[in-house]
Swiss-Prot record:
Coiled-coil region: none
Protein name: Photosystem I assembly protein Ycf3
Chief location: membrane
TPR repeat intervals: 35-68, 72-105, 120-153
Source species of the chain: Gloeobacter violaceus (strain ATCC 29082 / PCC 7421)
Name of the gene this protein is made from: ycf3
Length: 171
C-alpha cells in the first residue's frame, strides 16, 4: 500500500490528498508524476525514520525521474539517510551526485563540509594533525562554495572560516 494511503495524521493526510489532486492536474508526463509520488513517499518515510523504506521509494523515483534538478534532491536525500546511519563515504558519494545534477545546492556542500570537519576533528584528537588539516581544507572548500551560493546562511561555518583564517579565501 502506498505510504500516502497509510498516513494517520489528519493534516499530513489532507496535504497528501491536495498534493495528489494538484499532481493529477499538472500538464506533465505520467512518468514524472510517478517519480514525484515515489519521491513524496520517500520523504514521508524518511520523516518517520523509516530509512529502509525511504531508500526504496527514492530508488524507484531515480529510475523514473529525468529532470536533473529533481534528481539532485533525490540524491541529496539519499545522502542524508546514509549520513544519519554513519555511512559517511556513501553519503559523500550521493552529495557529489546531487552536485553533478545541480551545482547550486548549498545544503549538499554544507553536509560535505560537516563530514570533513567531523573527520578532521576526529583524527586531530588521535594526534594526526596533517590528516586533520587535509579534512579541514576540504571542509573549508565546501563551506566557501556553500556560503557563496547562500551568503546569509551557514553562519557557524562562516565563523569557523574566520577563526581558522580561511575566511579571506571566500573573496
Amino acid at each position: 500500500m502506498p505510504r500516502n494511503q497509510r498516513n494517520d495524521n489528519f493534516i499530513d493526510k489532507s496535504f497528501t490528498v491536495m498534493a495528489d489532486m494538484i499532481l493529477q492536474m499538472m500538464p506533465v508526463k505520467r512518468q514524472a508524476k510517478e517519480a514525484f509520488a515515489y519521491y513524496r513517499d520517500g520523504m514521508a518515510a524518511q520523516a518517520d525514520g523509516d530509512y529502509a523504506e525511504a531508500l526504496e521509494y527514492y530508488n524507484e523515483a531515480l529510475k523514473l525521474e529525468e529532470d536533473a534538478y529533481d534528481r539532485s534532491f533525490i540524491h541529496y536525500n539519499i545522502g542524508l539517510i546514509h549520513a544519519a546511519n554513519g555511512a559517511h563515504d556513501v553519503a559523500l558519494d550521493y552529495y557529489d551526485k546531487a552536485l553533478e545534477e545541480n551545482p547550486r545546492l548549498p545544503q549538499a556542500l554544507n553536509n560535505i563540509a560537516v563530514i570533513h570537519h567531523f573527520r578532521g576533528a576526529k583524527v586531530e584528537e588521535e594526534g594526526q594533525p596533517e590528516q586533520a588539516e587535509e579534512h579541514y581544507a576540504k571542509a573549508a572548500a565546501a563551506w566557501i562554495r556553500a556560503v557563496r551560493l547562500a551568503p546569509d546562511n551557514y553562519i557557524e561555518a562562516q565563523n569557523w572560516l574566520k577563526t581558522t583564517g580561511r575566511f579571506e579565501l571566500l573573496y
